A protein has these predicted regions:
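Secreted/processed peptides and extracellular or luminal domains of membrane proteins
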Residues: 48, 52-55, 228, 282-285
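Conserved alpha-helical substructure of the radical SAM core
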Residues: 2-111
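Short glycine/proline- and charge-enriched loop/turn segments
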Residues: 52-57, 147, 215, 299
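Short capping micro-motif at the N-terminus of alpha-helices
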Residues: 265-267, 292-293
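Glycine-centered loop/turn positions within well-structured domains
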Residues: 44, 146-147, 274, 300
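Radical SAM enzyme core and accessory elements
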Residues: 1-24, 273-348
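Radical SAM enzyme [4Fe-4S]-AdoMet core and its adjacent flexible, acidic
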Residues: 3-7, 14-16, 142, 147, ...
Length: 348
């Protein structure tokens, strides 16, 4: 499988010896991307992610400390890991996150560190995170209307805080900025055109994401599902869209652009057109479970091995070996899921 040449503008220098290493699963997919959940806690209660009453939080001693996370990344970087994404819950609620970023950015072989956030706390942390080594940010924003944003997030004042976080991200030079919009019929689908129009004015990547049945949201997912194909049909009413050639990141989005627009429109289709054949990632949960797939029950306990001083490389290799070919979710059904848990508990 040919290796994609990274964008030199956002990738740290990589020694030749490190560049030759790679992790390849049983289906020939190169795994070079790890999503790291640093906390299961969140300061919002988004309807598609977490029940209104919250969830039982992990105890402090159940969560990996920063040195334990760095140990996992050091081992996996020697095996071919190249890119990291810091997630939660909401990662910015974890104290002194920038110290972890500094540790991870110093690890040989790591090319890029991204952050997924709801941006509520980003205004005060953007500059420090940029200096520590975060290269880019993805920001969740499901409505451009203040009352509706509050309804979806179940917290007051959400939109204003997110927009201030966005402004701070731009001011410190995060590029590109990606905005994730979870599509929900009869909730925010009437804003599809409004979000798309932003790309004609701003160099942002607006990404429409199909809602997935996870945790307690299976009924919502079934009732609210709208495909990205339908979203694109609505966007095309604004003008012609052209596919964007080449990768614009580490993930599964397919991108389009209006003629002359500085920004792009992306679609992420886990339900209508799964992208498992090009999956390049694994997930490390806040409590130290290495998950080869977002869906399903397969996970490997790295925390116990770390705390007993054991070599975790064999565990990583075994998890890589048993990574499934695809998830088996069908819209409106949880059959084959192996027991879904909330996105806040897996890092999405």
């Amino acid at each position: 499988m040919p290796e994609t040449k990274p964008d030199s503008s956002s990738v740290r220098s990589l020694p030749a010896a490190a560049a030759s290493r790679s992790m390849v699963d049983s289906f020939g997919r190169r795994i070079e991307y790890l999503r790291i959940s640093v906390t299961d806690k969140c300061n919002l209660r988004c309807v598609y992610c977490m029940p209104v009453e919250g969830l039982p939080w992990l105890k402090r001693d159940e969560i990996l400390d920063y040195e334990e996370i760095a140990r996992v990344v050091r081992v996996m970087a020697k095996m071919g890991l190249r890119r990291l994404r810091i997630t939660g819950g909401e990662p910015l609620v974890r104290r002194d996150l920038s110290s972890l970023i500094r540790m991870l950015s110093a690890i040989d072989g790591i090319e890029n560190i991204a952050l997924s956030t709801n941006a509520v706390l980003l205004e005060d942390q953007a500059e420090e995170l940029k200096a520590a080594g975060v290269d880019r940010v993805n920001i969740s924003l499901d409505s451009l209307r203040a009352d509706r944003a509050d309804t979806i997030a179940r917290r007051p004042g959400t939109l204003d805080k997110v927009l201030r976080g966005l402004a701070a991200a731009e001011a410190v030079g995060f590029e590109p900025i990606k905005i994730n919009v979870v599509l929900m019929r009869d909730s925010n689908d009437d804003e599809i055109a409004d979000f798309a129009a932003i790309t004609r004015e701003r160099p942002w990547h607006i990404r429409f994401i199909e809602i997935m049945p996870t945790g307690s949201n299976t009924d919502l997912s079934a009732d609210s599902f709208i495909s990205c194909n339908e979203a694109l049909e609505r966007v095309r009413e604004l003008g012609d869209l052209k596919p964007v050639q080449g990768p614009l990141g580490n993930g599964p989005a397919t991108y389009y652009r209006f003629d002359g627009a500085p920004g792009t429109i992306g679609v992420i289709t886990p339900m209508s057109h799964n992208f498992c054949d090009r999956c390049n990632r694994m997930r490390l949960t806040a409590d130290g479970q290495l998950r080869p797939c977002l869906f399903g029950s397969i996970q490997t306990d790295l925390r116990s091995a770390l705390r007993q001083g054991e070599d975790i490389r064999p565990l990583v290799e075994e998890t890589l070996r048993i990574k499934p070919e695809r998830h088996w979710l069908v819209q409106g059904s949880t059959e084959g899921s192996g027991g879904l848990i909330a996105l806040s508990q897996t890092g999405g």
